Amino acid sequence: MISCGARLAPFDIAELREIMSYDEMELDKIGDRKTALFLIMSDTDTTFNFVIAMLQSQLFNLLCDKADDEYGGRLPVHVRVIADEFANIGQIPQFDKLIATIRSREISASIILQSQSQLKAIGIVKKSVVVKTH
């Protein structure tokens, strides 16, 4: 219970509860039409990084379900997620499995990290891999 309470503590902030109480982002429209969505987080305060991770997790789940249920497995408009500072947003559950299954649904994800060690730190890979760098 203590761990649960600690994780939910940010919801004691009225402004966060307000933001999370309704949907004005229309994530369900992404994949139907060309859309640009920018998620900006603080680089000095990690308190709300979990909100970005939750949103991205929900977005991937929503898009996969939408592709399967409404479009026979492929979205009409390709969705490309470019996740800069990916290691700093928090964990997206089963992201390693997710990136292996989204491509067939017209969804792609490019994650941008500062170092190879961040791949291990966020749990995407268990051992060293070759990564193309510029």
Where are these regions (language model features)?
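P-loop NTPase motor domains
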Residues: 1-107
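Conserved ATP-driven motor cores of ASCE-family P-loop NTPases powering translocation/secretion/packaging/pilus
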Residues: 98-134
